[in-house]
């Protein structure tokens, strides 16, 4: 069994953001190593937690890790993508929830398990699937997607300004023979980026690997679907805590939360906004919560984390 030495980022802040009711119904949308689930379970008495993860490694690990809570009937593990949130909960007889937490991005064990192919630090087959049962892998994206599709995902999901050069280099390399491994891909990307640009900004393949991973797992599409369902499922007083690790995710969450907390178009000059026109949701923090200096010292992966929390008012 894979060992989850995953340090959960903003653990206490994210769970505190949910304002847990001991008898409430909660969801951990991203089970991973069970950090948030374990913290939520400590605060539940007669409540119940549904913890989602499409990665069977996380499910198997937590069947043992959180076994006592499962036996007590306080926890149900759900092996499915969180974009299936509404249907998966309905199958359990749940149509409303008191809170849900999202901890986005790849969990450390997925990065650290070389054979999963998420990292440019280890040589491994090109895979990057969070759900290992799905057919689409990084191998197909890199070897079969067109030049135009590669440029699109590198720009859109990697914010990579050398997207065209990288896509062209991938196209040239795969015409000779298929690109099989993460190291092959990392070297192709590195060579495609001008030498001057390689000297700063971290590993030259970082943005490309992020872009391909997001494309393989449709991460942004899944997040948008899931958040829409979560907003609809929330009871009055219920909250959503979302931890993001990169600007694309954070922008999506910020936009969706802004939309949910905005006033409708009203005639100008109204002295008082009628109660039924008030927004259904409010932001708990105007600005995102960031990790403390102490947390950054012990967890280098926390540096880009941001927490946003929203509450249903009516």
Curated annotation (Swiss-Prot):
Where is this protein primarily located? cytoplasm
Q: Which reaction does it catalyse?
A: cytidine(1402) in 16S rRNA + S-adenosyl-L-methionine = N(4)-methylcytidine(1402) in 16S rRNA + S-adenosyl-L-homocysteine + H(+)
- GO CC terms: cytoplasm
Residues the record lists as binding S-adenosyl-L-methionine: 34-36, 53, 82, 103, 110
Keyword Ligase applies: no
Q: What is its EC number?
A: 2.1.1.199
Matching entries from InterPro entries are given as: RsmH, SAM-dep_MeTrfase_MraW_recog, SAM-dependent_MTases_sf
Q: Which Pfam families match?
A: Methyltransf_5 (PF01795)
**Per the record's keyword annotation, is Transferase included, yes or no?**
yes
Question: NCBIfam families, alphabetically?
Answer: 16S rRNA (cytosine(1402)-N(4))-methyltransferase RsmH
Per the entry, what this protein does is:
Specifically methylates the N4 position of cytidine in position 1402 (C1402) of 16S rRNA.
Spell out the HAMAP family in the cross-references.
Answer: 16SrRNA_methyltr_H
* Record-stated family: Belongs to the methyltransferase superfamily. RsmH family.
Protein name, UniProt field: Ribosomal RNA small subunit methyltransferase H
UniProt organism field: Limosilactobacillus fermentum (strain NBRC 3956 / LMG 18251)
């Amino acid at each position: 069994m894979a060992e989850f030495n995953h340090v959960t980022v903003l653990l206490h802040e994210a769970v505190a953001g949910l304002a847990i009711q001991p008898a409430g119904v909660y969801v951990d949308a991203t089970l991973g190593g069970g950090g948030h689930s374990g913290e939520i379970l400590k605060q539940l008495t007669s409540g119940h937690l549904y913890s989602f993860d499409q990665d069977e490694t996380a499910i198997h690990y937590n069947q043992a890790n959180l076994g006592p809570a499962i036996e007590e009937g306080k926890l149900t593990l759900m092996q499915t993508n969180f974009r299936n949130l509404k249907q998966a909960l309905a199958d359990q007889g749940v149509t409303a929830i008191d809170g849900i937490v999202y901890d986005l991005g790849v969990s450390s064990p997925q990065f650290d398990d070389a054979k999963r192919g998420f990292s440019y630090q280890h040589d491994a087959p090109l895979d990057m699937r969070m759900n290992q049962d799905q057919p689409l892998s990084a191998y197909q994206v890199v070897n079969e997607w067109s030049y135009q599709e590669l440029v699109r995902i590198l720009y859109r999901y990697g914010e990579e300004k050398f997207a065209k050069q990288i896509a062209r280099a991938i196209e040239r390399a795969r015409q000779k023979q298929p690109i099989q491994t993460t190291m092959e891909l990392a070297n192709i990307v590195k060579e495609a980026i001008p030498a001057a640009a390689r000297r700063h900004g971290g590993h030259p393949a970082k943005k490309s690997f992020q872009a391909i991973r997001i494309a393989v797992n449709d991460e942004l599409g899944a997040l948008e679907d899931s958040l829409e369902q979560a907003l609809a499922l929330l009871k009055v007083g219920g909250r959503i805590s979302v931890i993001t690790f990169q600007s694309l995710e954070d922008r999506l969450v910020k936009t969706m939360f802004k939309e949910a907390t905005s006033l409708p178009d009203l005639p100008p000059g109204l002295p008082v906004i009628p109660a039924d026109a008030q927004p259904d949701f409010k932001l708990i923090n105007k600005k995102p919560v960031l990790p403390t200096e102490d947390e950054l010292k012990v967890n280098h992966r926390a540096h880009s984390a941001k927490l946003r929390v929203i509450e249903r008012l009516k």
